[in-house]
Curated annotation (Swiss-Prot):
Tissues/organs with expression: Expressed by the venom gland.
Record function comment: Beta toxins bind voltage-independently at site-4 of sodium channels (Nav) and shift the voltage of activation toward more negative potentials thereby affecting sodium channel activation and promoting spontaneous and repetitive firing. This toxin is active against mammals and crustaceans.
Coiled coil stretches, renumbered: none
Cellular localisation: Secreted
Ranges of residues in domain LCN-type CS-alpha/beta: 1-13
Entry keyword Secreted: yes
Main localization, broad class: secreted
Protein name: Toxin TdII-2
Sequence similarity: Belongs to the long (4 C-C) scorpion toxin superfamily. Sodium channel inhibitor family. Beta subfamily.
Keywords, alphabetical: Ion channel impairing toxin, Neurotoxin, Secreted, Toxin, Voltage-gated sodium channel impairing toxin
Taxonomy, superkingdom: Eukaryota
Length: 13
């Protein structure tokens, strides 16, 4: 998916 996980800067899931 296109988005950023909270707590992970620049880590896309």
């Amino acid at each position: 998916k296109d988005g950023y996980l909270p707590g992970n800067e620049g880590c896309k899931y």
